[in-house]
Each structure stands twice: as structure tokens, then as C-alpha cells.
Amino acid sequence: MKASELREKSVEELNAELLGLLREQFNLRMQHATGQLTQTNQLKLVRRNIARVKTIITSKAGV
């Protein structure tokens, strides 16, 4: 997901996206802990996407 795509969304849509990403991160962490996760780079990608969404939410709140 690109930052330019996220900037076009409303704050409500971004909050929904953030909630979905946090759930995905939780599921990936559980899979990693039980040894079921084969693509460990997914954790890094989701964490960065969460940071992108939070950054854009903060920038929209400041405007």
C-alpha cells in the first residue's frame, strides 16, 4: 500500500485500515510464535504499513 493511496482516504477509512492491520499483525505474531509463519518478512511489511497509516492520520489531524 502506497502513502499516496492512503492520503486519498478519509480519517474514518484510515482508522478502519489501521484496525485491520493491527489484527493482521497479531495473527502474524501468533503464527510466528507457533512456528507456522514461513514468510517472516510479512511482519516487517505490516509494521511499516501501520506506521504509514498512523503518520497520515496524525498529519490529517494536524490540518
Curated annotation (Swiss-Prot):
InterPro entries: Ribosomal_protein_uL29, Ribosomal_uL29, Ribosomal_uL29_CS, Ribosomal_uL29_sf. GO terms for cellular component: cytosolic large ribosomal subunit. It comes from Shewanella frigidimarina (strain NCIMB 400). Belongs to the universal ribosomal protein uL29 family. One of its GO terms (biological process) is translation. HAMAP family: Ribosomal_uL29. Keywords: Ribonucleoprotein, Ribosomal protein. Transmembrane segments: none annotated. One of its GO terms (molecular function) is structural constituent of ribosome. It comes from the Bacteria. It holds the Pfam family Ribosomal_L29. The gene is rpmC. SUPFAM superfamilies: Ribosomal protein L29 (L29p) (SSF46561). The keyword Nucleotidyltransferase does not apply. This is Large ribosomal subunit protein uL29. PROSITE patterns: RIBOSOMAL_L29.
